[in-house]
Regions:
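"…together with the soluble PPM/PP2C metallo-phosphatase catalytic core" -> "…together
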Residues: 2-158
Length: 158
């Protein structure tokens, strides 16, 4: 489904998604505490003072889905993004309860990026950096797109 974009719809999508998040985040926090899906401080990578619930991504994903279902029309790109997002949320949920090894997380990121690039049609054919225009030939353009998407997924996950 393709999102129908105009000023009114964009405002409504943002408002509804935000309101859903405001409602769902506290609920998922309580569920996370109940199932002990907590992020405990370790002094190495996690410097928070007290344990934090880890299931907030589910609330954000569900909020996104509500906005999408209310205002979207069918498109291969959006379907590929939804499939990839669902896969990432699913593995993130499992990781919140029982840690998933980094190599399996990276494999998941690859599958998600591959889905969006190959199935969804998101491909970087050229990039301009500091006035330099780089053009990527096939199949290098797909490889660069997948690497870029994996890097982006990892930046967001930090």
């Amino acid at each position: 489904m393709e999102l129908v974009v105009n000023g009114h719809n964009v405002f409504l999508v943002i408002l509804i998604t935000f309101l859903c998040s405001v409602i769902l985040v506290p609920v998922t926090m309580k569920v996370a505490i109940h199932v002990r899906a907590m992020d405990y401080p370790d002094g190495v990578r996690k410097f928070q003072k007290k344990p934090m619930p880890r299931l907030g991504g589910i609330a954000i994903f569900l909020s996104f889905m509500v906005g999408y279902m209310l205002f979207a029309r069918e498109s291969t790109m959006m379907l590929s993004i939804l499939m990839a997002s669902f896969l990432l949320v699913l593995v993130g949920f499992v990781d919140s309860i029982n840690p998933v090894k980094a190599k399996y997380q990276l494999l998941t990121h690859f599958i998600a990026a591959f889905t969006v690039s190959v199935y969804g049609g998101l491909v970087l054919n050229n990039v301009s950096i500091l006035g330099l225009n780089l053009t990527f030939p096939y199949p290098l353009n797909y490889l660069i797109t997948i690497i870029f998407l994996i890097a982006f997924i990892n930046m967001v996950n930090l």
